[in-house]
Amino acid sequence: AGIKTNIHYVLGNNSIDEAIERLQHNDFPVGINAVIFLLHKPVGLGCEENVLHINDPRVKKFFEIVDNQKFNFKIGFDSCSIPAVLNLTKNISRESIDTCEGARWSMYITSDMKALPCSFDNQEMRWAYDISNDTIQNAWDSPQFEDFRNHFRTSCAGCKNRMSCMGGCPIRPQIVLCDHIEKTV
């Protein structure tokens, strides 16, 4: 029918072995456009046990395969994966990646009119701004959003990847796949 199909694949402790197997054996459906790997986050129904860790050899193996093997489809990652892409690959063009867009290019608005830099803050609402009687612009310019952006400005001083990574996720620091000594998340 001419429709491009992208598969979104949540990558966690419960799925990384299958992802490695599928990549190694080119076992994704023929004709797909891309596989977009989304890093598991411990929010909503997500659990802490599924969070990947940088020292897990499977994580290194997964990124080595992605970095060195050729596929008949594109591979993409969510912005939460960028610390791992920067730390564990050499052949992925740095110009093709961007880190967390929360409060930089996007915001999330809850059903009860709370503006958040990212939907993953919808449980703790640490950076929430109530727009039920206010504007989206005021939320964007708020101290809460500025505090969130400040993480990206000040994290991981001295790291060579700082400008591309910006320290990773301030909401769920346990998902940041980085082992650099400069890591401050």
Language model region names:
Residues 1-131:
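Radical SAM enzyme [4Fe-4S]-AdoMet core and its adjacent flexible, acidic
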Residues 114-115, 119-185:
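Flexible mid-to-C-terminal extensions adjoining Fe-S/redox cofactors in radical SAM and related proteins
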